[in-house]
Each structure stands twice: as C-alpha cells, then as structure tokens.
Amino acid sequence: MDATTTHSRLSEHDIYLFREGSHGRLYDKLGCQLDEAGAHFAVWAPNARAVAVIGSFNAWRDDAAVLRPRDDGSGIWEGFVAGVAAGDVYKYSIVCQDGRVAEKADPFAQYAEVPPATGSRAWRSAHRWADDAWMAGRARANALDAPFSIYELHLGSWRRAQDGALPGYREIAPQLAAYVVEWGFTHVELMPLSEHPFYGSWGYQTTGYFAATARYGTPDDLMFLIDTLHQAGVGVILDWVPSHFPSDAHGLAEFDGTYLYEHADPRQGFHPEWHSCIFNYGRHEVCAFLLSSALFWLERFHIDGLRVDAVASMLYLDYGRQHGEWVPNRYGGRENLDAVAFLRRLNEAVYRDHPGVQTIAEESTAWPMVSRPLYVGGLGFGMKWNMGWMHDSLDYFRHDPLFRKFHHGRITFSIWYAFHENFVLPLSHDEVVYGKGSLIGKMPGDSWQQFAGLRALFGYMWAHPGKKLLFMGGEFGQRREWTHEGELEWWVLDRPEHAGLRHWVGDLNRLYRERAALHELDFDEAGFQWIDSDDSENSVLSFLRKSRNGATVLVICNFTPVTRPNYTLGVPRAGFWREALNSDATLYGGSGAGNLGGVETVPVPAHGHYQSLTLTLPPLAVLFLIPEVDDARPDS
C-alpha cells in the first residue's frame, strides 16, 4: 500500500536550493513532519530501488507505507502516512540496487529512541520559550568585545542522580544555572548532544544531526534547560560535529546502498584515526544537510554559539594520513577546497541569519584567517581555539619552578601571535583524558605548590588576551582524570584547598566581567602592553591590560615558590594602585603574602615609565592591581 502524496512539503524552489547546497531549512521539509492526521515523510535516497516507512504505527510492515520518488530527479522519496503520532518509533526500509534491504534511522529525525535502540521517533515540540529578554540582548552579551568565560561540561558526568543514573535535562537545569551564575561564568559549552549510539564517544560520533540525545530526556526537556540558562543570563554554546560520522549500520553510512553522504574512495571518505566516515563536502545535498543542522540548533533550540569540532581534519586532505594515502586537490595541494567552501557558506549563513550568534573553530594548525571575515578571505568564524597557548602554557607549568627560567619563552611566546586570530584560551576536556591526568596533577611539587601553581595558571589565563574556556572539575582542582562514567568528585570541596581554588576562579570571573580592560580588547593589540617580559631569572612576567578608554589593570605573575620583596616595576600612572586580586590570599588557600591592599607609586623611573611601584610578589602567585583613578570609572 502506497503512502499518499497529495500534499508535498517541498516546492520547486526547495528542490533548487537543496541541489545547490544552500538550503538551510531542510528540517522543515525532510524527515517526519507531523500534523493532526499523521505525518509527511521525505527522505533523500537517490540510488534506492524502493523506500518505505516502517514503525510502531504499521506493525513494522515494509509494504504498509511505501514512499514514492519525486519526478524531478532530486532523489527524494515522500508520502503522507495517516495515524502517526508524537513519540511513535519508525525507520526507513530501503531496498538497495543490489536487492539488499537496509533499515535506516531518519537523517532528519528530531527525536530518537534511547540508545542502544536505534529507531527514530516522530516529534513536534510544545515548548513555550520564556527567554525573550535574553534573546533581545544576546547580541551584546555575545559580542567579541564582551566577556566570555565558558564552562565546558559533559552533561552525563557533571552530576548524577543519587542512584548513579544519568541526569535529565529538566532536572539538572536549575542546578546548572545556579552553579554557573554563582561562580561567575558567562556561558556554558555543552559537549555534543546530537544523538550518538556510543556513550563513550562523548557525542563526537553523531548519527542524529537534528535529534537531541534521548539519554537525558525529550527535545522539549533540552529546550527547558537552555531556557533556564538564558533566564539566568547564561549563554549556551553547543559542540557540533560536521567533520565525520560513525559507520553504524542504522546511520548515514552507505545510506541508500551507495556512498551517499561520504566519499566512495576511502582515501577521501574514511578517517584512519577515528575509524569513521568523512562527509563529501563536494556534494551539494550533503552541504545543505549540514547547513540545515547548524541552523536547526540555532533556530529551534536558541543556541548562542556553535563550537565546530575538528576543523583541521576538514581543511586538510592528508589529515592523519601518510604519503600515498590521500588524494590531492585539483591544484595538486592538500587543502580540501570543498570543505573550505562549505565552512565559508556555513559562517555566511549563520552570521546573516543570526547576527547575535558566534561560531568557534577548534582548529589546531596555522591555517590563516580562520576567524577573519569572508570579505578579506577568511573562513568567517567568530573565534578560534588557541591550541598553541594551551600546549605552551601546560608545558611550562609542568616544569619544576627551579628550571622554569630556562623555559621562559614558552610562557611569553603566545603574545607574539595573540592578535592574529580571535582566540579562545581552552583548558578543555581533551587535556584531562587518555592518561593525561587532571589539571592539578600536572602541577609539580607538594600539594600546596600544586594548588598555588594551578591558581597561578588560572590567574595568568584570565589576564592573558583571549576568551576563557575551562572544563568542569578544573575549577575546584579535581584530582582524578575525567571519566564519562560517574560524576565529578564534588566531595573534595569539603577540603579548604579545593574550595579555595573554586573561590579564586569565581573572583577571577567577577573581575574579568567587571573590568573592561580585561576583556574589551581581547582581540586588539591596543589592549595589551608589556611592562617586563624578560625577567627569566626570577620567572616573573608583568604587563598591562587596557580598555578602549585607557583604563588599565596591572598583572604580575611570579612563577616560582619564592617570595620576592622590594620588586620594582615601572607603571604609566602615578598614585595609589589597589591590589584587586592576589592568588596567594588565605581565602584561596595561599600563604597570605601581599601588599596590604595596595601600593603608592614613587617617582623612580623604571621600565620606560617615570614612576614605579615597589611590591612584594607572593610565591607562585598572580597579582592584579588597579590604579585608584580607574576604580572610580564605571566603564573601566
């Protein structure tokens, strides 16, 4: 029995945009579209011999709801099936050219069964958004000159239920919102929530590019979580993975019996490191699929930013491959020109349709102008992760403080390229897995020195130009390496050193948000000035951060466990400089050394300035000082 095809949702213009690769709203056209009488189904399977919808509503019979191919050569099969209701489970039964029958999940499904089950579910949202105030002001909160302190988390292992069960979107919403607000973060970044069959992939092996994972609840439950965060004034960034997809039989791989979403040649279509499939960005319909996925999360879920995973693997044809294992582009080079074109189209569409949103590239190479506009030849991302800063900083802090003077260039080098891109400074989940240990475990010395060292790293990070990203558990110094099984070690907060570290992060966030000098010119060299970058002997750095109106914050970093009294620094302004933050304060678990609230300048020239400060530098500590004249300025 054929499904009826009396009311196609696809116009000729839709088909044109689909074939051109520029359709960004396919989630309204393809997949399962419910109404009161049933559902319209449409699926792209150009090489199939036959396609049927099978599901709980027709006893999984492959002859009960047979779809018909459109007569326009688009490769889309469609039809209306009566009696389908929200929550019904279904799949496509696809007869391949060789006679094989594949049962596939719907690529455009907006809900799915809880893994390991693999069926799609019919869905229509009933959520009523209450985040109008956030959405109206989002462009300001998300601007490149605004503070970004991003709390990265894996939803399934942040907190668990008392019985150890996975949390629910709806249940965790008030806890998460209250936590990030209390500790001063401006945004959360959720590791991928698109449906994925293997929990241990953390969401990075996606099968459902339009479906929020059912492990934590329904799509409306996720909307409730995002709504709650927005109402608390917290932005939401979502990890999105257009770089590859898994080869699970129910997913996109060989969808209609042919290599439809991926390349047929394994040198182009198979990822040797991840054992996954690579999208064929040269196929326009695939680009429209991915573009629609990105816009779906922004429009239907009010996501404020997309962190695009593994961009480097998209840009290079030889990524993870040896000589002879890859196919050069038409010019003989290793650049993936189709992926470049797709990323530019993606960013063009996002910033055109959602100017208050940011796209953030996880890109680990020196590809030029990743976060520069399209009109100057860039890829068009809003920001890019600074992997060089992360590697150099962690390498420096791993060294015994006694020997850091021999590695001083590691900690100063990042400033030389800090303004080439719009950088995010990431201490992400990638640095606390696969045997790398925890952040606190990377610090040398005894327990006191480890906590002092991590406070110093965070102080340096929050003072350094660039937006901030910290993975959950780092804020209180979890000692165990992160695992997706179980929750964070919340119990360690009963210990003063862990609680003190979290208090330090909270105060860093507060100062960072309050002081324009610490965030307004993150991407402009006018916002940074060295006082002294060359004191390698003492492992001391000192610099100024500046706002547009000239307000300043002085930052001094002492990366050895030696108190340094009578340390002289030249400064640009005479008068009293208040010690706004000191990571060695007893409140944070430090020794209490410092400058009794601040220091008055003396007319002694130093470091190119006519006046100077004589300071006590606490051990393994970072100081933030603010001139008294700037304390009274509301826009400083």
Swiss-Prot record:
UniProt keyword tRNA-binding present: no
Pathway the protein takes part in: Glycan biosynthesis; glycogen biosynthesis
Domain of life: Bacteria
Family designation: Belongs to the glycosyl hydrolase 13 family. GlgB subfamily.
EC number of this enzyme: 2.4.1.18
SMART domains found in the cross-reference section: Aamy
Oligomeric form and interacting partners: Monomer.
Gene Ontology molecular function: 1,4-alpha-glucan branching enzyme activity; cation binding; hydrolase activity, hydrolyzing O-glycosyl compounds
Protein name as catalogued: 1,4-alpha-glucan branching enzyme GlgB
Record's keyword terms, sorted: Carbohydrate metabolism, Glycogen biosynthesis, Glycogen metabolism, Glycosyltransferase, Transferase
Source organism: Aromatoleum aromaticum (strain DSM 19018 / LMG 30748 / EbN1) (Azoarcus sp. (strain EbN1))
